[in-house]
A protein has these predicted regions:
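Phosphate-binding glycine-rich loops and their immediate beta-loop-alpha structural context
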Residues: 1-77
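Short glycine-rich anion-binding loops that position phosphate/pyrophosphate groups of nucleotides
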Residues: 15-16, 80-85, 127-130
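Short glycine-/acidic-enriched loop or helix-start segments at secondary-structure transitions
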Residues: 20, 86-88, 134-135
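Short, solvent-exposed amphipathic alpha-helical segments in soluble enzyme
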Residues: 24-29, 66-67, 91-94, 138-142
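Structural signal for hydrophobic packing residues in well-ordered secondary-structure cores
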Residues: 45, 65, 69-72, 93, ...
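Catalytic-core segments of thiol-dependent peptidases
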Residues: 73-83, 97
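Short Gly/Thr/Asp-enriched flexible loops that form oxyanion-binding sites at enzyme active sites
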Residues: 84-96
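Flexible glycine/proline-rich
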Residues: 94-149
Length: 149
């Protein structure tokens, strides 16, 4: 019997973020969305890779997404999915592939993104932690289930 491993990459974005274990400065926040999403998807059978924090820069985000797509079967990008001046996720996904949905009638989680790059699903999670968890649960878990996980 062949057993296939599904690899999910998780990319946190945001210039205000610091890694867990660090003390954020004024206006900063500890990055937690990828840890929570990795735990959720890992329980479903995925092998998750959490990448380093990507600052709010479309060039850096593009490089991170290209790497994530090469190394994984599915990619989740945390934050940058809204319509602010530092939210580049949808534009970068569109430049590398296609955005299928941007904005879902789901609360919390409205600004979530569903896209595809090189035939692989890409999900843009909102930055707000409970919205990110909701989007991961409602969008990524069903994809894993459809793949048999």
């Amino acid at each position: 019997m062949d057993v296939r491993e599904v690899r999910v990459g998780l990319i946190p974005t945001g210039s205000e973020l610091v890694p867990a274990g660090s003390l954020p400065g004024s206006g900063g926040a500890v990055e937690s969305n990828t840890a929570v999403s990795a735990a959720l998807l890992g329980e479903a059978g995925a092998t998750c890779t959490r990448y380093g924090i990507v600052r709010d820069d479309p060039v850096l985000l593009r490089e991170a997404i290209e790497r994530g797509i090469r190394e994984n079967d599915m990619l989740l990008i945390s934050a940058g999915s809204s319509a602010g001046t530092r939210d580049f996720t949808a534009a970068v996904i569109a430049g590398l592939g296609e955005v299928l949905v941007h904005g879902i009638a789901m609360k919390p989680g409205l600004p979530a993104i569903v896209g595809r790059i090189d035939g692989k699903p890409v999900i843009g999670l909102p930055g707000y932690p409970i919205a990110a968890l909701t989007a991961a649960r409602e969008l990524a878990l069903p994809l894993l289930a459809a793949w048999g996980f």
